[in-house]
A protein has these predicted regions:
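The feature captures the beta-strand-to-loop junction immediately N-terminal to the Walker
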Residues: 38-40
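Helix-to-loop junction immediately C-terminal to a conserved catalytic motif
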Residues: 53
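Conserved ABC transporter NBD signature motif
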Residues: 58-69, 81, 109-114
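ABC ATPase NBD coupling module
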Residues: 69-89, 124, 214-217
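ABC ATPase C-loop
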Residues: 143-144
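Walker B catalytic motif
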Residues: 155-156
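Conserved beta-strand-loop-alpha-helix hinge in the C-terminal portion
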Residues: 204-219
Length: 219
């Protein structure tokens, strides 16, 4: 089992030109375990995920990983240390086959095919020809094979059927890693779990607590 790990944003601010996308937010995602960043488009949820990964710079505040300030550590170095980001778009290599995409993550793809057997007949196809849901399965399979300590995923179940989406969240919740996902709505499979949720609105955190608390507050 992986040792306990955690990633945090502390008083984090991010600007895109004149627009401030994050207004000094603080959040912590412990692991192993699943944390959800919840919010509508423009809420800052994706920006927060990217800030943790190092693909967008902070204008103020810090990113902390296992007690160490990694704010100035570039994204590629965070990846080398065991952080895996699965963005919403361009998460697979479209010109390569499904098999080649998987082999870039690990020589043996058995684990990925166990997780998503739907990919088995697609192995010879180029990833760019897959449907949106199939591409998400492939991208997440690569993340599973990477055996990362921290896994960050933007809208993991986008384009998937309800059954496959539920399976996806079972897989993510079962990883021996710190897993952070960004979603517009809380997935049904997480409603009664002790999953940690941060709800963002216009760049600020408006709720933090367990998923069940969020549902109770809205009942």
């Amino acid at each position: 089992m992986t040792a306990k790990t955690a990633v945090s944003l502390r008083h984090a601010r991010v600007r895109y030109g004149p627009l401030e996308a994050l207004h000094g937010i603080t959040l912590t995602a412990p692991g192993p375990g699943l944390t959800v960043l919840l919010g509508r488009n423009g809420s800052g949820r994706t920006t927060a995920l990217r800030a943790l990964a190092g693909t967008v710079p902070l204008t103020d505040g810090s990113v902390v990983w296992d007690g160490t300030d990694v704010t100035r550590v570039p994204a590629y170095e965070r990846a080398r240390r065991g952080l895996c980001l699965v963005p919403e778009r361009q998460a697979v290599f479209g010109s390569l086959t499904v098999r080649e995409n998987l082999e870039l993550a690990a020589p043996a793809a058995d684990l990925a095919l166990d997780a998503y057997p739907q990919l088995a007949p697609l192995l010879p196809r180029r990833a760019g020809t897959l449907s949106g849901g199939e591409q998400r399965m492939l991208a997440l399979s690569r993340a599973l094979l990477a055996r990362a300590r921290v896994v960050l995923v933007d809208e993991p179940a986008q384009g998937m059927s309800p059954t496959v989406a539920a399976r996806t969240y079972e897989l993510l919740a079962g990883l021996d890693a710190c897993v952070v996902v960004a979603e517009q709505r809380l997935p049904p499979t997480l409603h009664d779990r002790t999953t940690i949720v941060y709800e963002l609105r216009r760049g600020s955190v408006v709720f933090s607590g367990e998923a069940a608390e969020l549902r109770t507050g809205r009942a």
